[in-house]
From Swiss-Prot:
Gene giving rise to this polypeptide: mscL
Annotated Gene3D superfamilies: Large-conductance mechanosensitive channel, MscL, domain 1
GO terms under cellular component: plasma membrane
Family affiliation: Belongs to the MscL family.
Annotated organism of origin: Chloroflexus aggregans (strain MD-66 / DSM 9485)
Keywords: Cell membrane, Ion channel, Ion transport, Membrane, Transmembrane, Transmembrane helix, Transport
Protein name according to UniProt: Large-conductance mechanosensitive channel
Keyword Ion transport appears in the UniProt entry: yes
Length: 137
């Protein structure tokens, strides 16, 4: 059983997946920092001076609150700033993954096309015709 597990782990796809998950987890921290520390302050500067986009919300029950946590404690809230952060994170991660995959595909050789089947010789065609005629009888 241990040998089977070792064989399973040593397959290329499993190792590639494990490396991808680990790198992806580490990369998420970089993207979160990029969004929270660089992009959000720039967007906040454009839309009203707030650098924390997660504090943009709309209380649905008419309550007033200064922070998202207070608004959530008071009732239902449409937290569109948090959603905007999540969308920006997703788009950046998806774009970077696209760039990585595109670059990796350039380095991976494309599999060779299988050679075309050889055309039958004239004698093989004649034998096939004879076979077909005999089959019709």
């Amino acid at each position: 059983m241990l040998n089977e597990f070792r064989t399973f782990i040593n397959r290329g796809n499993v190792l590639d997946l494990a490396v991808g998950v680990i790198i992806g987890a580490a990369f998420t921290a970089i993207i979160n920092s990029l969004v929270n520390d660089i992009i959000n302050p720039l967007l906040g500067l454009l839309v009203g001076g707030r650098t924390d986009m997660s504090n943009y919300f709309l209380p649905l029950a008419g309550q007033t609150a200064t922070t998202l946590a207070e608004a959530r404690a008071a009732g239902p809230v449409l937290a569109y700033g948090s959603f905007l952060n999540a969308v920006i994170n997703f788009l950046l991660v998806a774009f970077v993954i696209f760039l990585i995959v595109r670059t990796a595909n350039r380095f991976n050789p494309k599999p060779a096309e299988p050679p075309a089947l050889p055309q039958p010789t004239p004698s093989e065609r004649l034998l096939a015709e004879i076979r077909d005629l005999l089959a019709q009888r």
